[in-house]
Amino acid sequence: MKNLILLFTLFSAALSFSQEEKNKEQEKIVEEFLTNCAEKYNYTIQMAEWQECLDNGLKKDSTIAYLWQQKAMPYFKARKYEIAMPFLDKAVKFNPKRWQSYRGFMKCIFTKSYKDAIADFEDCKKKFGNSYVMDHSYDFYIAISYLQLNEYEKAEKLLQNYVTEMLEKRNGLEHHTAYFYLGITKYELKKYEEAIAIYDKALKIYPNFSDVKYHKAICLLLTGKNDDAKEMLSQAKEDFKKGYKLNEDNVFYETYPYQLQGYFLGL
């Protein structure tokens, strides 16, 4: 028995050392072909050069998930989704813990493949727990996906839980985007007074949030508060023109669900 334990210990140590060595080799490849090659180019105007560097790195080791993700990322930003997704699938294949939730995010916000996004996030929750990606929990993106699939009650429940969880488990943290989308679910469920109350919470955090003011104006109008609605809409228009908009990191590349557009305001 002692010999078996010793043998197992030695085998485990050998595996650990082998993985360490592999990680070091992969880091060298990433440095050579991403840091010192691809990143010398601007992928917006030099996509071919960027991709060639990464391809050369993958010839050295095709299992480096980060290089696959870096191949995918600029294509997503260029809205070439069908080119991008197979590369991201490769990243998930080789490192699901790191990249599957990111793929769920890309499906939710970029490709608008909401059922697929839900499937990715639910699978991540089973395997890794309800963690965070791109500033929000997996449940937040599942809720956004349900919102876009007109399953408003499911979205409402998840967003309410998300808001409550932040308050209780993250030292009273509140997020204006979370309140914005929770307010949207209330609006879609015709709970207009509740939506207004939620929007006010968002405005307490981000007083010039034009998207919230626009949707609050709609709820005010639908509850017969015409003068208040007119004033709120006027504020939304002015704040929008000043650039006070939905400020998630990726709004530069994609339109988020229910995001205020200039033409909504006659601009």
Ranges and model annotations:
Residues 1-26:
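Bacterial Sec-dependent N-terminal signal peptides
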Residues 66, 70, 102-107, 137, ...:
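Canonical tetratricopeptide repeat
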Residues 19-69, 77-78, 86, 264-265:
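N-terminal leader/linker segments that initiate helical-solenoid repeat arrays
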Residues 21-28, 173, 222, 226-267:
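Terminal, low-structured helical/coil segments at or just beyond the last alpha-helical repeat
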